[in-house]
């Protein structure tokens, strides 16, 4: 077994060999290297054909019309384009937007920017399980609400929001719904012919495709209009200018094709791995699962080990690639804002580790990881005076520490 072991599939995934093969065919002089916008020769036509084939493959996974798929540089750009694009286009109808406190930073920071431009944003608090309900959204609606943005599968805790029910509500009120689905492709069924979703963001690198490419679903029926945030040659029907990266687009298409083919079997396998891992660590004292046990993807186990500092646990697990918080924010020493929104105290938020399993995770790796986690937690607790106090029956939350 090779070390270190990668258990951070929610941060990024390796490119599937089938995807890499297809991408490599679009780079060299003997390959399909043309500019898809070159209309005057066969190199351009071939590249355009490959791009449109990939567009169909992405649309097929989510049961959309290929004409509703707009290429972007990733889910961050898709979130920006969807939220800013819709807010600016429909600003004359209203200036109120609704989102949740547990969105990805790409949504939260986009909302913050719109607040600086004069929009008003309501940030909803989830349940302690990490779920946002239609009732919460309904209670926050106003006459001037134009857009609701809700994450589908949470990147930190893996919980799944009921997008179908939320879509019924927003559509009945004539309000646009944007969904960040970066973490859900290949994990959860998405049927955009049934879901009442207006805008949906996708990423390739969370689904065994390359980094630097994503897509935005923009509904045609009912027709949704967005203002471009990137200006230039008018590519992608004017919504997103810039020469299309054929090799990355082809990679995303193939990744989504494979996801559609393998999803059912892969979910069963990963659920078995996740359960196997949890069974081996669940007897640790003061262990907490963050997020709903039922409405979550099996790929994600976010655990808090009380009386152990998450950062020191990560250092102790030097042969495991895991994370505390999300990859985008875990460089800061602030406790995870997602866990704080769930009502976790600072200590539990700081002691959290996200284990995420994927296509290339094996039983052997999971067993090794579980063993190392148990050893490290027990070892660190032996060193912890707080653990001693807890074992002696002291209620640590009642202690007033002297300030230096």
Swiss-Prot record:
Pyridoxal 5'-phosphate binds at residues 75-76, 155, 183, 203-205, 243. Its cofactor is pyridoxal 5'-phosphate. Coiled coil: none annotated. InterPro entries: Aminotrans_V_dom, Aminotrans_V_PyrdxlP_BS, Cys_deSase_IscS, Cysteine_dSase, PyrdxlP-dep_Trfase, PyrdxlP-dep_Trfase_major, PyrdxlP-dep_Trfase_small. Its EC number is 2.8.1.7. One of its GO terms (cellular component) is L-cysteine desulfurase complex. Its main location: cytoplasm. GO terms for molecular function: 2 iron, 2 sulfur cluster binding; cysteine desulfurase activity; metal ion binding; pyridoxal phosphate binding. One of its GO terms (biological process) is [2Fe-2S] cluster assembly. The modification N6-(pyridoxal phosphate)lysine is found at residue 206. It catalyses: (sulfur carrier)-H + L-cysteine = (sulfur carrier)-SH + L-alanine. Pathway: Cofactor biosynthesis; iron-sulfur cluster biosynthesis. The active site is at 328 (cysteine persulfide intermediate). Keywords: 2Fe-2S, Cytoplasm, Iron, Iron-sulfur, Metal-binding, Pyridoxal phosphate, Transferase. The keyword Transmembrane helix does not apply. SUPFAM superfamilies: PLP-dependent transferases (SSF53383). [2Fe-2S] cluster binds at residue 328. It is found in: Cytoplasm. Pfam families: Aminotran_5. It is an enzyme of class 2 (transferase). Belongs to the class-V pyridoxal-phosphate-dependent aminotransferase family. NifS/IscS subfamily. NCBIfam families: IscS (TIGR02006), PRK14012.1 (NF010611). Homodimer. Forms a heterotetramer with IscU, interacts with other sulfur acceptors. Master enzyme that delivers sulfur to a number of partners involved in Fe-S cluster assembly, tRNA modification or cofactor biosynthesis. Catalyzes the removal of elemental sulfur atoms from cysteine to produce alanine. Functions as a sulfur delivery protein for Fe-S cluster synthesis onto IscU, an Fe-S scaffold assembly protein, as well as other S acceptor proteins. This is Cysteine desulfurase IscS. It comes from Pseudomonas fluorescens (strain SBW25). The lineage of its organism: Bacteria, Pseudomonadati, Pseudomonadota, Gammaproteobacteria, Pseudomonadales. The gene is iscS.
């Amino acid at each position: 077994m090779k070390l270190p072991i990668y258990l951070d599939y929610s941060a990024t995934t390796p490119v599937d060999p089938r995807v890499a093969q297809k991408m490599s065919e679009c780079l060299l002089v003997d390959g399909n290297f043309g500019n898809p916008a070159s209309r005057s020769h066969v190199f351009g036509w071939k590249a355009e054909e490959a791009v449109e084939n990939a567009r169909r493959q992405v649309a097929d996974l989510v049961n959309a019309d290929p004409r509703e798929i707009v290429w972007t540089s990733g889910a961050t750009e898709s979130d920006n384009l969807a939220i800013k694009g819709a807010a600016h286009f429909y600003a004359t109808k209203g200036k109120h937007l609704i989102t949740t406190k547990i969105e990805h930073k790409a949504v939260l920071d986009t909302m913050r920017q719109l607040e600086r431009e004069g929009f008003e944003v309501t940030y909803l608090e989830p349940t302690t399980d990490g779920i946002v309900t239609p009732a919460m959204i309904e209670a926050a609606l106003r006459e001037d609400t134009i857009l609701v943005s809700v994450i589908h599968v949470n990147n930190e805790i893996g919980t799944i929001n009921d997008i179908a029910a939320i879509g019924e509500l927003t559509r009945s009120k004539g309000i646009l719904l944007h969904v960040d689905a970066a973490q859900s492709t290949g994990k959860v069924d998405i049927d955009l012919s049934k879901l009442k979703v207006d805008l949906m963001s996708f990423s390739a690198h969370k689904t065994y495709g390359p980094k630097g490419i994503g897509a935005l679903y923009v509904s045609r029926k009912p027709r949704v209009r967005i203002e471009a945030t990137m200006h230039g040659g008018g590519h992608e029907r004017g919504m997103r200018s810039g020469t299309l990266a054929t090799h990355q687009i082809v990679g995303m298409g193939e990744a989504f094709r494979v996801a559609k083919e393998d999803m059912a079997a892969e979910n069963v396998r990963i659920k078995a791995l996740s359960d196997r891992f949890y069974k081996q660590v669940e007897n640790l004292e003061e262990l907490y699962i963050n997020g709903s046990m039922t409405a979550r993807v099996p790929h994600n186990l976010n655990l808090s080990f009380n009386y152990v500092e998450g950062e020191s646990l990560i250092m102790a697990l030097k042969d495991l690639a895991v994370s505390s918080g999300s990859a985008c924010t875990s460089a800061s020493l602030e406790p995870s804002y997602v866990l704080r929104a769930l009502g976790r105290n600072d200590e539990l938020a700081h002691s959290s580790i996200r284990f995420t399993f994927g296509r290339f995770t094996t039983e052997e790796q999971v067993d090794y990881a579980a063993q190392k986690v148990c050893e490290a937690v027990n070892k660190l607790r032996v060193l912890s005076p707080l653990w001693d106090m807890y074992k002696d029956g002291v209620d640590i939350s009642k202690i007033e520490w002297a300030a230096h």
